[in-house]
């Protein structure tokens, strides 16, 4: 079987909706709501069609297609700048140290502060691979294709990139973190708040969430111990992000307390090490395993293949050339697998 990453279109709505129903809670970028998904696809098509260098709040939706069956089996998203349409809120973990001369005692406490520090940062997110395809490195293909897309359209993205990892969700679909903070102010369960946010944005957080810092020590133990931890299903994703140069810098999601990972865009490994060159006239039979991408905007494609870098040129295998629709002299991006 062969797979290719390509821009999503309205014809992919049903496949995306079926996958959205498989995600479980805490996956706001792929809500199981047809109207929301339709709006996301329409916005993505507008972003792909726009030309220009200015950075605005856009979302590019990509899908993983089985080219033999034409069935979509995964998806991922790239956001040019968060916080344009709706405020982008995070909790930042701070430390406050105080000293009492009378008691001769120093007390240090950790606080959760509601902040907009990350507004304007680009984001990679929305990655979901159908459970039936979780073998053969397709999750890695989805994840790293986003970086080659950014490399190919660097002028449309910011100086930093973030990635939010889903936090700990219990067996009932609830969030200990939400129950300890947000749930006390909104009268909503975690799933209700999560679904509302996915469809309507998080302005309601700005309207009702307390603005004063929250002392972590005052939260119950169940909430404290999940702060900054990814959901077990996201641990591999966290390792992949760390391998790309992302790090956890004390920002957590306001809903489930999951970690927000950050990196300088030009230092992300798959961007910094990406090779850009013209396709050589020789067809490669064997070579270095790689991710190879070609095309701009709505013509973007990415797949696994083989390459041989020859200075400014690159030889690639015949199957990749066919999947990407490239020939001699066309330019491609690639990164070692």
Where does each model-flagged region fall?
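Conserved GNAT acetyl-CoA-binding A-motif
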Residues: 118-127, 147-166, 176, 225-228
């Amino acid at each position: 079987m062969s797979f290719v990453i390509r821009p999503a279109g309205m014809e992919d709505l049903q496949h995306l909706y079926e996958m959205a129903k498989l995600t479980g809670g805490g996956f706001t970028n792929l809500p199981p709501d047809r109207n929301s998904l339709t709006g996301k696809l329409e916005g993505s098509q507008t972003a792909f069609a726009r030309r220009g260098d200015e950075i605005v709040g856009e979302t590019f939706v990509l899908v993983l297609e089985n080219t033999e069956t034409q069935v979509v089996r995964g998806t991922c998203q790239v956001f040019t700048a968060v916080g344009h349409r709706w405020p982008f809120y995070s909790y930042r973990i701070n430390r406050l140290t105080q000293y009492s001369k009378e008691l001769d005692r120093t007390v240090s406490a950790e606080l959760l502060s509601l902040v907009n520090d990350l507004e304007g940062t680009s984001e990679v997110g929305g990655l979901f691979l159908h459970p039936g395809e979780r073998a053969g490195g397709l999750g890695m293909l989805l994840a790293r294709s986003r970086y080659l897309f950014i490399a190919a359209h660097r002028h449309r993205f910011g100086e930093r990139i973030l990635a939010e990892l889903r936090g700990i969700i219990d067996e009932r679909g609830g969030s200990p973190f939400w129950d300890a903070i947000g749930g006390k102010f909104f009268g909503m369960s975690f799933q209700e708040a999560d679904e509302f946010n996915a469809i309507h944005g998080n302005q309601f957080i700005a309207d009702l969430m307390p603005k004063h810092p929250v002392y972590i020590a005052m939260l119950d133990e169940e909430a404290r111990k999940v702060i900054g931890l990814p959901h077990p299903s996201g641990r591999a994703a966290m390792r992949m992000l760390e391998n790309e140069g992302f790090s956890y810098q004390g920002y957590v999601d306001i809903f489930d307390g999951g970690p927000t990972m950050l990196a300088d865009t030009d230092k992300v490994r798959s961007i910094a090490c990406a090779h850009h060159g013209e396709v050589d006239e020789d067809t490669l039979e064997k070579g270095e395993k790689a991710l190879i991408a070609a095309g701009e905007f709505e013509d973007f494609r990415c797949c696994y293949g083989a390459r041989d870098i020859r200075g400014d040129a690159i030889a690639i295998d015949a199957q990749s050339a066919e999947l990407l629709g490239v020939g001699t002299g066309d330019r491609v991006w690639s990164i070692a697998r």
